[in-house]
């Protein structure tokens, strides 16, 4: 593929004319090599029939270079070689570097996407079913304790299990690694009885001490984590015997059991993290339906775990690949092998069947009223949020009387800092553009999820983030508001913290939901929260896919997915 790249470099520099007149010095400079190596490359390209080279003798004399092959032809050949050898990084970089036109880029992306989807092959009279699934988020860490991204949670949910579980669209909590559980009347003591002979991927049998280890490492971590306000209510985890675990809570918390259904509360083996010397996040071992066999910055490969306690998955192998562009912009037709796409664009092929997973993503802006600055003034906040509402379909508009709009206020001369993470940088830039158009001066600061958990939010004026409205919505709202109070002025903070304490003790699901709505309404009335927009999370799939179900986050559940054989 190096020869392909060298051809494309020459074509990019000298391919504009039917025949180019070049010196050896110019060729060496273009290729970034010596005269001797440049001649070797020219001879190889001529041998491939890609160029015609007519040399002229003498130093500095110009020779004739004629291109016999087109750049698209050679680029496509290079990409196909990369795809055939599963070198996705090279393929992606090639598309970025050599696609000089949108039509070529679409062609190359289409070829790459053909690599994805369902593939079946025979090995020793056995059919091996493989699903290649692209994700836009790069996987960094699959440790339930440290993962930050939804894509990481998606993969982790197929490697690990929790004590209890929920299926997509169901409020009822079902047995997981625990076959049953009970609690005392004050609901501060929870006892879980484990299934027998559940195996981890490395052959160890699950025991109560593994559960104790999994939760104790949560309780002692100093890292800011999703749902930390829930598991910080755990006073003690104790193994009563190899098959029984008891949790003692500091106070009743009706979100405790739903928390145990999340991928954050997955059970890990107590002996493995030490043995792997800190690399557990990239070499995880759980009890789930798939085990990880390979993970690098571009590819995560899962293989079926045949001894899974809830039955073997239908797929034999799942390859999850990082593809940085929006998959839907190059979606293949129904004749392609590409079967599953997350979050397809509205322009995807009409031949695709779509189903909503009943979950949505809400993007919002919050104001830092704890910081001394222009947004500590409610009238300025009202004006800022009114600017964001103007001419949009955003939810939760903050209506402001025209007499209170202060378009010429001193805040316009003060730079407002907008903090977010890279995944939401586009939304933050759109917010900045709207406010700039209203006379404000804004600067976007995009930091990693880890940095975002630190003081960055407290130093910003506006924070752009999102809420996944899935089956864990109440947990996410509790975590969101518990975090948000850190950048709110004391009176509002005390009010919200009091409401959250009541919600945590409320056994009725609908009453808890009403409590969260009251918090949202209060923040909107005080111009401290503005919802930018909300859109459903969808999954597109072709008719040949069977067993499409969703996990609690709205992702396709791979353990039930299967493809009928060609008969």
Question: Which role does the model predict for each range below?
Answer:
Residues 17-20, 41, 148, 180-224:
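Aromatic- and charge-enriched surface segment that lines or borders ligand/interaction sites
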Residues 56, 113-117, 383-407, 426-431, ...:
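Detector for C-terminal structural segments
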Residues 64, 228-271, 294:
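Surface-exposed binding/hinge segments that line
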Residues 134-183, 216:
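N-terminal lobe/hinge region of extracytoplasmic solute-binding protein
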Residues 138-152, 204, 256-263, 540-556:
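A structural "hinge/loop" feature
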Residues 146-150, 154-158, 164-169, 261-313, ...:
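Gly/Pro-rich hinge or "lid" segments in bacterial periplasmic/extracellular proteins
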Residues 303-306, 354-380, 501-502:
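A bilobed periplasmic-binding-protein/Venus flytrap-type ligand-binding module shared by bacterial periplasmic
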Residues 307-349:
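Ligand-site clamp/hinge motif
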């Amino acid at each position: 593929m190096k020869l392909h790249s060298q051809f494309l470099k020459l074509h990019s520099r000298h391919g504009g004319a039917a025949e180019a007149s070049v010196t050896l010095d110019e060729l060496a400079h273009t290729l970034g090599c010596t005269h001797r190596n440049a001649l070797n490359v020219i001879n190889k390209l001529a041998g491939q029939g890609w160029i015609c080279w007519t040399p002229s003798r003498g130093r500095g004399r110009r020779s004739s270079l004629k291109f016999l092959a087109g750049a698209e032809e050679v680029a496509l050949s290079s990409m196909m070689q990369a795809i055939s050898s599963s070198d996705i990084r090279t393929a992606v970089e090639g598309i970025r570097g050599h696609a000089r036109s949108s039509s070529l880029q679409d062609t190359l992306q289409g070829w790459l996407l053909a690599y994805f989807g369902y593939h079946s092959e025979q090995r020793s009279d056995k059919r091996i079913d493989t699903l290649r699934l692209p994700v836009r988020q790069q996987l960094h860490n699959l440790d339930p304790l440290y993962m930050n991204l939804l894509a990481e949670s998606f993969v982790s949910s197929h490697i690990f299990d929790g004590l209890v579980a929920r299926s997509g669209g169901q409020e009822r909590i079902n047995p997981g690694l625990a076959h049953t559980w009970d609690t005392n009347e004050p609901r501060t003591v929870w006892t879980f009885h484990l299934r027998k002979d559940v195996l981890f991927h490395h052959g160890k049998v699950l025991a109560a001490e593994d559960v104790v280890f999994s939760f104790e490492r949560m309780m002692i971590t100093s890292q800011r984590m999703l749902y930390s306000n829930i598991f910080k209510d755990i006073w003690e985890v104790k193994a009563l015997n190899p098959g029984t675990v008891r949790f003692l809570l500091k106070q009743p918390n009706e979100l405790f059991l739903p928390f145990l259904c999340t991928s954050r509360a997955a059970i890990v083996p107590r002996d493995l993290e030490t043995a792997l010397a800190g690399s557990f996040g990239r070499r995880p071992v759980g009890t789930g339906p798939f085990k990880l066999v390979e993970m690098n910055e571009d590819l995560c490969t899962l293989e079926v775990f045949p001894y899974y306690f809830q039955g073997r998955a239908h797929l034999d192998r799942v390859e999850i690949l990082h593809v940085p562009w929006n998959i839907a912009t190059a979606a293949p037709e129904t004749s392609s092998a590409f079967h599953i796409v997350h979050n397809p664009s509205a322009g995807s092929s009409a031949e695709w069947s779509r189903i909503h997973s009943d979950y949505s993503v809400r993007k919002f802006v919050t104001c830092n009223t704890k910081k001394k600055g222009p947004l500590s003034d409610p009238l300025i906040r009202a004006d800022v949020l009114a600017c964001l509402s103007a001419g949009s379909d955003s939810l939760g508009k903050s209506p402001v009387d025209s007499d209170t709009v202060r378009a010429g206020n001193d805040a316009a001369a003060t730079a407002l800092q907008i903090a977010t993470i890279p995944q939401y940088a586009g939304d933050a830039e759109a917010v900045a553009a709207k406010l700039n158009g209203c006379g404000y001066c804004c600067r976007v600061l995009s930091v990693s999820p880890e940095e975002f958990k630190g003081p960055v939010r407290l130093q910003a004026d506006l924070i752009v983030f999102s809420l996944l409205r899935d089956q864990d919505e109440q947990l996410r709202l509790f975590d969101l508001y518990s975090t948000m109070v850190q950048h709110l002025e004391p009176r509002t903070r005390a009010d919200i913290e009091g409401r959250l304490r009541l919600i945590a003790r409320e056994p009725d699901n609908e009453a808890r939901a009403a409590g969260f709505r009251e918090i949202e309404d209060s923040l909107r009335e005080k111009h401290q929260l503005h919802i930018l927009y909300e859109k459903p999370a969808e999954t597109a799939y072709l008719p040949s896919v069977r067993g499409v179900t969703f996990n609690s986050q709205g992702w396709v559940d791979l353990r039930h997915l299967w493809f009928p054989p060609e008969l």
